[in-house]
Amino acid sequence: RSVHHPTAEDEVVGICQDLLRIDTSNYGDGRGPGERAAAEYVMGALTEVGLEPELFESAPGRANVVVRLPGADAARPALVLHGHLDVVPAAAEDWSVDPFAGEERAGLLWGRGAVDMKDMDAMILSVVRQMAREGRRPARD
């Protein structure tokens, strides 16, 4: 029996869809519904591959995730990759698709955050997960 192993593209698309399906609308007053949930999703994705992420809240519900990948050369300055999980609120009536469904149409993902910046978050997360699975270390932290 053959086992399906997802490709790197499959993983990026899946992570991006998962993130798009979490409503992380930022209304500017701390009442956004899902930033903490999205951060917990990221924590789980990193923990699943043996990494030790940390979660910090700057305010209730406003969560940030930090993980450090030790580099091969500690003498080199560190490189920071970062993204944000919150999105501008979306009114469903202004959309031809559910803005929080992570729908795929004609090879494109649709949803609030698909281009700012849950797509890049998914790519970074996928690459970091792959590096952890393979035991690869970046050149620098």
Please report, for each region that a protein language model flagged, where it lies by residue:
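Acidic/His- and Gly-rich active-site-bordering loop/insert found
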Residues: 2-115, 121, 130-140
